[in-house]
Amino acid sequence: ISGYIDRLPATLRQIGVLSGHLGLEMKDGLLTKLNADVELVDGMLGIPGIDRDAAFETADLVFSYSRPSDSFMVSKAALNFADQRRLSFDGAVTQFHAPSANVKGMIEANNLPIQSLLDGWPDPVAADLKQTLRQRFRGGQFKFVKAEFLGAFVPETSALTLSRLGLESRFSGVRANFASGQYKRLVATIGGALGMNVGKGGQIQDVLVDLEMTDGSMLLDGYERPVDLAYGQVKSIIRGDVATLENLALDMGSAG
C-alpha cells in the first residue's frame, strides 16, 4: 500500500504483517482514497525527524488518506513493544503532497526510558534545552509522557520543524545535578511531574515543575562539608523570565 502513496516517508513503510479492513479507490494507477482499520504484527516504527526505528509487537491503527483533499489522518494508533513500552498517537497531515506539509498531532507513551526520549529529540527543537537536560539529568523513566505538537514536515529531507510543543509528564528514578551559583553541589534522585510549552523557534514559554527529591547532597559556597538531603519537595512555575516558587520543603536530617 505504501508504494502507492508517493509522499509517504520511507521510515513508515516497514509496517509488518497486516490484518483487518481496508477500503481504497484507484485512478490512473494512483491511490486516491484509503480507509483502514487494521492490526499490525512484528513491524517497525520510524517517526519523521527522529533518526531511530523501533520494532513493535502489535499495533492497532485507524487511518485515512485522500488525494483530493491532500490529507493523511490517523484517528487511532496504539502500539505495544516487547519491553512493555506503550505508545499511542493521533494526528493529521494536510497539504500532504506539498513541498512542506502541515503536521498536527498528539503522542502519548508509558514506561519510556528518559534517555530514549533525549536520543530521539529532533535537533531543531529547543536545542539548548536538550543540551541542558543531557548535562543535568541521567537515568530514570517516564511513567507517562504526552506531547501535543504543530509543525511542518519536508518529505524530501524527512525534516520535521515544530512551531508549537506542549509537554506533560510524570517520571521517577532520575539522578539530577542542580549545581549553580552558590550551590557548588546539589544532587538528588528525583521524581514527579514536569510540563512545558515551547513556541516557534524553540522558545520556552512556560514550565511547571513539581518534584520530590531523595538521597541528595548539597554543598554551599564558603562551606567545607556537604549536607545530606534526605527528602525534599519543590513546586515552581516559570513563565518567561519570571519564576514563582509555590512550595519548598527540605529535610536535612540532623543538619536541620
Question: Predicted segments — roles?
Answer:
Residues 126-127:
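Outer membrane beta-barrel transmembrane domains
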Residues 156-162:
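Short loop/turn motifs that connect adjacent beta-strands in outer-membrane beta-barrel proteins
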Residues 1-6, 13-29, 36-101, 106-119, ...:
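Hydrophobic lipid-interacting interfaces of membrane-associated proteins
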